[in-house]
Amino acid sequence: MNLLTVTNLSAGYAGKQVIKDISFFVAPKTIVGILGANGCGKTTLIKAIANLLPHTGSCQLDDTYLENASPRQLALLCGYIPQKSGISIDLSLLDVVLMGFNPKLSLLQSPTEQMKKEAFDTLCSVGLGSRKDDNFQQLSEGQKQLCLLARTFVLKRRLLLLDEPESALDFRLRYETMGLLRTYVAKNNAAALVTLHDPSLALNYCDTLLVLSDCGLLGELQPFSTPISKMEPLLSSIYGTISLTTLSTRSGEKRLIMIKEDDAC
């Protein structure tokens, strides 16, 4: 059974259509990467699914149509991480993660001791447990992103929507973050949709890739099963001529590497 089914989704800004008639489904325990050139609608797609933009079409999460969900119900079902945190006040890391429980709390209700324990445990899972009392504003951009990831994890939502989570991360943290996502979706029978700029990261951590171009879905591929001969033309259509090769790590794992060809040759 599909966890998420998106049907004929169209959305845009200020009267301009950015995505049109996009349909796909997402299975449980999977990560779906969204690739495409700047301006093709990656962020628009994520925001439309999160019900943050007016749109036509439908997004069904299990038995719930997200268009019909209340803000609280939507917040319980979906976790959304934008490109910028939106946090401008001084808060401890623990308090930021505790914000993830807000959909479960009434207006004047405080987090329970159990919630505080779960928030701390989740901070530990992303490597920030020792900094729980530090000021969020004093973190590096990469550390802020990890803290926001913990905030999204803590409620164990079924669907995570992440807009360029790797953009502020260094090489090591990019791969650690995708590893954390993979662990989360497997453990919680959940799924994640992720917009990415790094195709090599997407090729090695995403179960499915949606390739966007000119308002629509250009194609889908499964990096772990689609033949390289079929992936190369699709990826070349958005990145220019590329070639893919497979390398083995020291532990014997296979990795896909994308190489940009010199268009001048």
Question: What is each model feature region?
Answer:
Residues 35-37:
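The feature captures the beta-strand-to-loop junction immediately N-terminal to the Walker
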Residues 50:
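Helix-to-loop junction immediately C-terminal to a conserved catalytic motif
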Residues 57-65, 74:
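Conserved ABC transporter NBD signature motif
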Residues 98, 113-131, 156:
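Conserved ABC ATPase "signature" region
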Residues 135-139:
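Conserved ABC ATPase signature
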Residues 160-164:
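Catalytic Walker B motif of ABC-type/P-loop ATPase nucleotide-binding domains
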Residues 231-265:
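ABC ATPase nucleotide-binding domains
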